[in-house]
UniProtKB/Swiss-Prot annotation:
Family under the similarity heading: Belongs to the AccD/PCCB family.
Gene that this sequence comes from: accD
Record-given protein name: Acetyl-coenzyme A carboxylase carboxyl transferase subunit beta
Cofactor section: Zn(2+)
Cofactor, free-text remark: Binds 1 zinc ion per subunit.
Protein's pathway: Lipid metabolism; malonyl-CoA biosynthesis; malonyl-CoA from acetyl-CoA: step 1/1
Species lineage: Bacteria, Pseudomonadati, Pseudomonadota, Betaproteobacteria, Burkholderiales
Subcellular location: Cytoplasm
Catalytic activity: N(6)-carboxybiotinyl-L-lysyl-[protein] + acetyl-CoA = N(6)-biotinyl-L-lysyl-[protein] + malonyl-CoA
């Protein structure tokens, strides 16, 4: 027995590994900002916002939609649209192999989920990026699901909301992915002509072709706190201009200060804030909204 073993009380000595077999893995999460060790269930109940420092962690598309939409009357749009390898693209790995890996890891078929439903009884269509699926990259499926979501909003005469979380256009689809920038913005023109609100919610990260196309075209542009928002990443810009960028450059607070976005809203207050905005923009009563 070492001198340390003699000093340590029996209760805090290392537990026998055999006695830990019944403890499930993944019970704890470490906050990437303040590094606090947090109980996973508490973090999930808090919509993946750190209760210690209010850092907004990344959240899955379906989990976000579950916390946003009313439980009744939800329906998914465009889930039957699946990705194809039209260009037979291959870098270090084949595109179908990357797709299969992403599908297995996320249980999604591509990087966007679109649902119709209601927020505080106000009807709406919501598109939500899944960043865990190939970095939320925008390819043909994402563009088509976005377009069908906007079309559904037109047919139902309801507002359209999009939560962005993307690294940009999908490299493996080349020109086809770049075409989605034009496709998505064209659909928003139809919404504008019909005088239907489009609300864009920028989450961490919103970059590349997504930020350069529809992300900033909302009638109201909202961002989550400290979200990274821009076209090229800060390291790429620094290497190009050979200068040190200002502190907080490309963060939501910096963009709000420069007038590039309209407001920053805490994720835990987004449901109520969106309902109030929808009621205001559509001139409907929002009596149910707290």
């Amino acid at each position: 027995m070492s001198w340390l073993d003699k000093l340590l009380p029996p209760k805090i000595k290392q537990t026998d590994p055999k006695s830990r077999k019944g403890i499930p893995e993944g019970l704890w999460i470490k906050c990437p900002s303040c590094e606090a060790v947090l109980y996973r269930n508490d973090v999930e109940a808090n919509l993946h916002v750190c209760p210690k420092c209010d850092h907004h962690m990344r959240i899955g598309a379906r989990e976000r939609l579950d916390g946003l939409l009313d439980p009744e009357g939800r329906y998914e749009i465009g889930q039957e649209i699946l990705p194809v390898d039209a260009l037979k693209f291959k870098d270090s790995r084949k595109y179908p192999d990357r797709l299969k890996e992403a599908m297995d890891e996320t249980d999604e078929t591509d990087a966007m989920v679109v649902m119709g439903g209601a927020i505080h009884t106000l009807p709406v269509v919501v598109a939500c990026f899944e960043f865990a699926f190939m970095g939320g990259s925008m390819g043909s499926v994402v563009g088509e699901r976005f377009a069908r979501g906007a079309q559904n909003a037109l047919e139902q005469n309801v507002p359209f909301i999009c939560f962005t979380a993307s690294g940009g256009a999908r490299m493996q689809e080349s020109l086809l992915s770049l075409m989605q920038m034009a496709k998505t913005t064209a659909m928003l023109t139809k919404l504008s002509e019909a005088k239907l609100p489009f609300i864009s919610v920028l989450t961490d990260p919103t970059m590349g072709g997504v930020s350069a196309s529809f992300a900033f075209l909302g009638d109201v542009v909202i961002a989550e706190p400290k979200a990274l928002i821009g076209f090229a990443g800060p390291r790429v810009i620094e290497q190009t201009v050979r200068e040190k960028l200002p502190e907080g450059f490309q963060r939501a607070e910096f963009l709000l200060q420069k007038g590039a976005i309209d407001m920053i809203v805490d994720r835990r207050k987004l449901r109520e804030e969106l309902a109030q905005l929808m009621a205001l923009l559509t001139r409907q009563p929002a009596d149910a909204v707290a």
